[in-house]
Design a protein with these regions (language model features):
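Surface-exposed extracellular loop regions of Gram-negative outer-membrane beta-barrel proteins
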Residues: 46-48, 93, 113-157, 178-204, ...
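Outer membrane beta-barrel strand-and-loop segments of large Gram-negative receptors
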Residues: 8, 12-18, 57-68, 151, ...
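Transmembrane beta-barrel strands of outer-membrane/channel proteins
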Residues: 31-37, 85-89, 118-122, 174-180, ...
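C-terminal beta-signal and adjacent terminal beta-strands/loops
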Residues: 235, 277-279, 289-308, 324-326, ...
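Face-selective signature of the C-terminal outer-membrane beta-barrel domain
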Residues: 1-95, 173, 236
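Short loop/turn motifs that connect adjacent beta-strands in outer-membrane beta-barrel proteins
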Residues: 22-26, 80, 113, 169, ...
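Residues that define the transmembrane beta-barrel architecture of outer-membrane proteins
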Residues: 9-13, 61-67, 98-100, 154-158, ...
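Gram-negative outer-membrane beta-barrel transporters
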Residues: 178, 202-293
């Protein structure tokens, strides 16, 4: 028995200003700032037993700000070598945490059709805003916010890439990257928990004893082959091979929930001019995606049967879902008016043509005393009518 009452609302306003200055043919300067004003109305209660009192998880109604400032310079050493460098600063008013981020990149043009690039950047990220306001009751009966002083999660990011234009309307891009994360929120006690896995189980984060002492590592290789739209057709192939690990407060390195190891996408489309005067168009688009499955913590069926509630295994993120596969096809026909700037498009978008069963999540079914699986959207035809004028 679990009962929840929630009202989690966030309203955001942005104030932006920037200034650009071209000093000469080699130097370019840009400075600016952004103030993100977050209006929050968080109220969440949970009740896990029928006759138990409700537990207040969030009860906060106010606002806070994330202020950012930056300075960026671009300098051309020559026609073939360009430097981009800058500083980015963050200030979070809620707990006065700050982050200064140096970044720079070099681009070397080997020829008019190919170039190398290298980049480094220190990047900082706020935690999900509701995490700061998780509340609990201390021994004196006072409401406390143990996560309120969490710092930014930070990462050092290194990239080396190569770009090639082998023919007109074609581009090939490859990139190798390495990312080292630190200041990741983990439990104050020894555990496998890490904020890096937030969102993997589609549930509400209720960890209220966090500290910025976790780490993580991501690295991989990406390849993109693109045919820009011309002569009535286009194409795009993207792929990535990667590894993603994290370390919790127990000091053990594990796969992150999102460590699918690989993903690739194929997108192609063709368009024909038809009808009187070739004004109308018919088209077909094809998309195919295949990705390694996410890692997950299996359910301990025996313990769940004993307690009557879902109990997870101690082998955290030790199992992997089957790979994700999906194929979409879209057919379209566009009527263009002869005398008016008016067009009408009819299209049939068939999603997951093969009706492949992609795993969404697992849960414990108390009635059948076994694991129950939920799946993502299956075969789904979608008819669309659009008018433009």
């Amino acid at each position: 028995f679990v009962r929840e009452k929630s009202n989690l609302a966030k309203t955001t306003y942005f104030l932006n200003a920037s200034y650009n200055l071209k000093i000469n043919s080699r130097w370019f300067l840009k400075v600016g700032f952004q103030d993100e004003i977050m209006g929050l109305d968080l109220n969440y209660k949970t009740k896990e037993q029928l006759f138990a009192p409700e537990k207040q998880i969030w009860d906060y109604k106010s606002s806070t700000n994330l202020v950012q400032g930056y300075a960026h310079i671009k300098y051309g050493f020559s026609k073939n070598l360009t430097l981009n460098a800058g500083l980015h600063a963050n200030y979070f008013l809620l707990n006065n945490s700050t982050a200064i981020e140096p970044r720079f990149g070099l681009v070397y043009n080997v020829s008019q059709k190919s170039s190398f690039n290298f980049g480094y950047g220190l990047h900082s990220q706020l935690q999900p805003i509701n995490v700061y306001f998780l509340q609990s009751i201390d021994n004196n009966g006072n409401t406390v916010y143990n996560n309120k002083n969490l710092d930014f999660t930070k990462s050092n990011h290194y990239v080396i890439g190569y770009n090639l234009q082998p023919a007109q309307d074609w581009r090939i891009k490859t990139e190798i990257y390495y990312q080292r994360l630190y200041n990741v929120p983990v439990n104050t006690f020894s555990s496998s928990y890490s904020m890096l896995n937030t969102g993997a189980r589609f549930n509400t984060e209720l960890e209220d004893n966090l500290i910025n002492k976790g780490t993580g590592t991501n690295y991989g290789l990406e390849l993109t082959v693109e045919k820009f739209f011309s002569k009535g057709y286009y194409g795009l192939f993207t792929s990535s091979i990667f590894d993603s690990k994290y370390t919790g407060s127990d000091g053990v390195e594990r796969n992150t929930a999102f460590n699918g190891k690989y993903v690739y996408n194929i997108l192609v489309g063709k368009e024909w001019n038809v009808g009187a005067g070739k004004r109308n168009k018919t088209s077909i688009d094809f998309k195919f995606t295949n990705a390694g499955g996410r890692y997950y913590t299996p359910i301990d069926v025996a313990s769940s049967q004993t307690t009557g509630r879902e109990q997870l295994s101690t082998n955290v993120y030790s199992s992997q879902y089957p790979s994700y596969t999906r194929m979409d096809i879209k057919f379209g026909y566009t009527f263009n008016s002869k005398v008016k700037k008016l067009s009408q498009t009819f299209s049939l978008d068939i999603q997951n043509v093969t009706n492949h069963k992609n795993v969404f999540s697992q849960s414990y079914d108390d009635r059948n005393q076994n694991v129950s699986w939920k799946y993502q959207l299956g075969f789904f035809p979608n008819f669309v009518y659009k008018i433009q004028f």
